[in-house]
Amino acid sequence: MQKNIQNNLITWYNKNHRHFPWLETKNPYYIWISEIMLQQTTTEAVIPYYTRFIETFDTIDKLAKASLEDVYKLWEGLGYYRRAKHIHETAQFICENFHGQFPTTYKDILNLKGIGPYTAGAICSIAYGMSTPAIDGNVLRIISRLYALKDNIALAKTQKKIAQIVSELLIGYDASAFNQGLMDLGATICRPLNPQCQNCPIVSFCKAKEIGQQKVLPISIKNIKHKELNYITGIITYQDQYLMIQNPAGLLENLYGFIQYELESPYRFMEEFEKQYHLPLSLVSYHGQVKHVFTHRTWHMHIYHFSISHLCNMKLYHLEDISLLPVSTAHLKVLKHYLKQK
């Protein structure tokens, strides 16, 4: 059974694989950048970001020497900025510890900041041809259906079990084509809903299809609580300039944005702001609400325009200057909404 699975999948992949710029290279640095960008972001959306990033930082050394703000600016719009910070720190680590050359062993790659087993496996198999499994959601789904596994794929022990199955399937075969074949199969045919079994190159070996469970499997039950948060978000202006701060920590660490507090009233906002910055505000107008959804939380930002009557020590920006800053996607939404209503 196994030999037919591998031959069928690799033959199908070689004929039908999708064409993306990061698939045209064996450069581990480029593959690493693409894999990090593809986390939590759709493939089509990544293409222009990847292209710009690689054109600007075509070597690890250039990335390591860049400022974090420059890296964030190129990342702007992709979200999950912690990924960009880890990339920057990891590039510096590689320059300091590997003479600017990307590591060549699975262990060394896995030890890099921001890289987990899937990304390490993908880099090793695609760049170096190693027989290392790359287990993402697509692979978990395919293997669960192929072997009709009833285990919860959200659990680490199930993921370990599937990794072992893939490791055995890889022995003696083109690891790069096999791993990428699984990814492409999951993205285009063996999809979460309504799998296109009639087009699947390995459907004749699929136990879930055989017992009519392909739309039921895999079992995936996650215990995640999604938070709903309400903020008063302040558009604070002095004449035609805007007050923005660089977030020192948290979800939007190092990104620029408007000041906001998890409060229920703009008047409480004014009190909190004056207490923190020793500067009085005047309430000008209300501009509605903007929602921004993160993976495990949703922000409901209630937008109020405040003004300050005199110059302060805090940094103020003209609109054209804001466009040059690495601003969080959530607060770019706020600004766009405000300007539309202004």
Explain the meaning of each model-derived region.
Residues M1-H19, E24, A187-K342:
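Intrinsically disordered, low-complexity, charged terminal extensions of DNA damage-control enzymes
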